């Protein structure tokens, strides 16, 4: 029998006092205890809420962006001995029960990274404007890197320790998701897409990326690809 894998859940959070408590409770319910919340200098009571739970809390002194928060969380998880790292959103869009299917291919040594894909699961009722943006992003990723992923900007991912050590996240903003895809291609990391459910509520839609932010991200990706 192989050793039990230490699974760490990394949650970047910015002004998520309204949802982070329920997110942590759901993760506990499904047996995930190694939870790392990175509070990216929230102005609300995100940190105060997190402190009521037995989880790791790291707080950035200034707001740096989701990419920076993810990098901070991954670095801490690696330092603390994680075998598998799962990145998970703080706004309640992701389901804790989906983590099992994400980590199984890694535990079985079938993949080094698994990418959650909401379009492979019919239960995800994706708003039409969001679907258009995500499909446009997928096309851009394919043209730039040759990887066809219809949901490259889904924050629900899992990676082995070895993959986490290979991945170099340089961007502080949302474009870090595209960097992960780029790193998979450049470093020939074995990956698989896994069907997951993404829940859309008024809260999560309000908190999510705005259309102008998405176009800004796409333009930065394209400029980076052209000029390196």
Segment roles from a protein language model:
Residues 148, 169-172, 181-199:
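Catalytic donor-sugar/metal-binding loop of nucleotide-sugar-dependent glycosyltransferases
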Residues 39-47, 92:
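A conserved acidic beta->alpha catalytic loop
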Residues 15-29:
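Short, well-formed alpha-helical segments that are part of the catalytic scaffolds
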Residues 62, 68-79, 96-174, 200-226:
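Acceptor/aglycone-binding surface of glycosyltransferases and processive sugar-polymer synthases
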Residues 18-22, 44-52:
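Acidic helix N-cap motif at the loop->helix transition within catalytic regions
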Residues 6-8:
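Cell-envelope/extracellular polymer assembly enzymes that use nucleotide-activated donors
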